[in-house]
Swiss-Prot record:
The keyword Metal-binding applies. This is Actin cytoskeleton-regulatory complex protein END3. It is found in: Cell membrane; Endosome membrane; Cytoplasm, Cytoskeleton, Actin patch. Component of the PAN1 actin cytoskeleton-regulatory complex required for the internalization of endosomes during actin-coupled endocytosis. The complex links the site of endocytosis to the cell membrane-associated actin cytoskeleton. Mediates uptake of external molecules and vacuolar degradation of plasma membrane proteins. Plays a role in the proper organization of the cell membrane-associated actin cytoskeleton and promotes its destabilization. InterPro entries: EF-hand-dom_pair (IPR011992), EF_Hand_1_Ca_BS (IPR018247), EF_hand_dom (IPR002048), EH_dom (IPR000261), End3 (IPR025604). Residues 280-405 form a coiled coil. The gene is END3. It comes from Ajellomyces capsulatus (strain NAm1 / WU24) (Darling's disease fungus).
Length: 405
């Protein structure tokens, strides 16, 4: 089993790139990502393949998880981990939240089926639009437990086997049957694991007040129709072992979380045989927190530079290195020039608001920094002038000494 994964420091670096390109939006389109992707100097056909692999949900854009996948693929290609773009995503690189989509797409037979349409029109008042096919790690783990507790010897689920679950939900029977028909286009007596997870996800959202969707993604529908995937735990392959963290907030403030009471009666609540093998982005720091971290880090770096410059200036006042017991004026002059150049650059960045100086620092602090650096620059110039005079005097003394001999 591969031990490779995307490290947290990589996620942080990718987030800085993603947030700078997305302008606060949750997705990147091709035009927004083009510059950073082409900086890799990979061929255009390779970048197209990387994009297709990373765009797991097939919406033509990259969310943050998919962007991380694309960047890691590119870095591995550049560093020689792959001779060419792989034909499919490695299991360890698949985001856990989208593992069901990847597995469903692997069931495609080459044709692109149309979306399934539900004939019933849902006119129930008070329901919300915006059904999302995304399964959080906690929800997916719960669906896995319900499936494992009710599957038959072929790894399939019948409609009636979940009757106790239906009884625990605030979902009308007509909506439950509509959801079943949506994931069971062949009208068979049983459904596969993929279809079961989708069915439970629809019921969960309906339980939370969302309308039953009218269509399903094409890749999911293909897996429902094939109904040939072996999901029995004894025969499970590494590529199928996707799971999720079982830690989930169970409070809604108005009713029990989907399936909690049912799983509690079954005695399997909180336990799952699944363990994650892909990359879990569920604990990724949110936008506001990332912005705070970035600004604090930049402020600390700026203060550290100023402190280092102040310390260097103080050490110069105490005298530089020595040659034969005397001051090394050449070294002092060189270091003073370097420090002067550094301070002038810092002063320019502070005045222009460039470099490490960002909008997160207060105007009053910037003014104080500008004044402090300006005073230090003037002091260094005066100090350098005095040292040059001293150096000239020493050279004159050396010449006089040589002539006297």
């Amino acid at each position: 089993m591969s031990e490779k994964k995307i490290e947290q420091w990589e996620v942080e670096r990718y987030w800085e790139i993603f947030s700078s390109l997305s302008n606060g939006q949750p997705h990147l389109n091709n035009a927004q990502a083009a510059t950073v992707l082409r900086n890799s100097r990979l061929r255009d056909d390779q970048l197209e393949k990387v994009w297709d692999l990373a765009d797991v949900d097939g919406d033509g854009e990259l969310d943050f998880e998919e962007f991380c996948v694309a960047m890691r693929l590119i870095f591995d290609l550049v560093n020689g981990e792959y001779a060419d773009v792989p034909h499919s995503l490695p299991d360890w690189l698949i985001p856990e939240s989208k593992a069901h989509l990847v597995q469903a797409s692997r069931a495609l037979t080459g044709r692109q089926p149309q979306f399934e349409r539900v004939e019933e029109e849902d006119d129930t008042p008070g329901l919300k639009d915006g059904f999302d096919w995304y399964m959080s790690p906690g929800d997916k783990s719960k669906y896995e437990e319900i499936y494992s507790a009710n599957r038959n010897h072929r790894g399939e689920i019948t409609f009636d086997s979940l009757q106790p679950l239906y009884d625990s939900l605030a979902v009308p029977d007509t909506d439950i049957r509509s959801a079943w028909n949506l994931v069971n286009p062949s009208a068979s007596s049983t459904i596969s694991k993929d279809a079961t997870l989708a069915f439970l996800h629809i019921l969960n959202n309906r339980h939370e007040g969302y309308r039953i969707p009218r269509t399903v993604p094409a890749s999911l529908r293909a897996s429902f129709e094939s109904n040939k995937i072996d999901y029995q735990l004894d025969n499970v392959r590494p590529a199928q072992r996707w799971g999720a963290d079982t830690d989930v907030d169970t409070s809604t403030g108005r009713k029990a979380k989907f399936g909690d009471a049912y799983l509690s009666r079954l005695g399997v609540g909180g336990r799952t045989t699944y363990r994650p093998q892909g990359t879990d982005f569920s604990n990724t720091i949110q936008d506001q927190e990332w912005e705070k971290v970035r600004l604090r880090r930049e402020l600390a770096e700026l203060e550290k530079k100023l402190e280092a410059a102040d310390g260097a200036m103080e050490s110069r006042k105490g005298g530089g290195g020595s040659v034969n017991g005397g001051p090394n004026w050449t070294l002092i002059k060189k270091e003073a020039l370097q420090l002067l150049e550094y301070k002038e650059r810092e002063l320019r960045e502070l005045r222009e608001g460039t470099g490490k100086v960002k909008e997160g620092e207060s105007l009053e602090r910037l003014r104080e920094d500008v004044k402090t650096v300006g005073d230090q620059v003037e002091g260094l110039r005066a100090h350098l002038a005095k040292r040059n005079e001293t150096l000239t005097e020493l050279k004159d003394q050396i010449r006089e000494e040589k002539r006297s001999r």
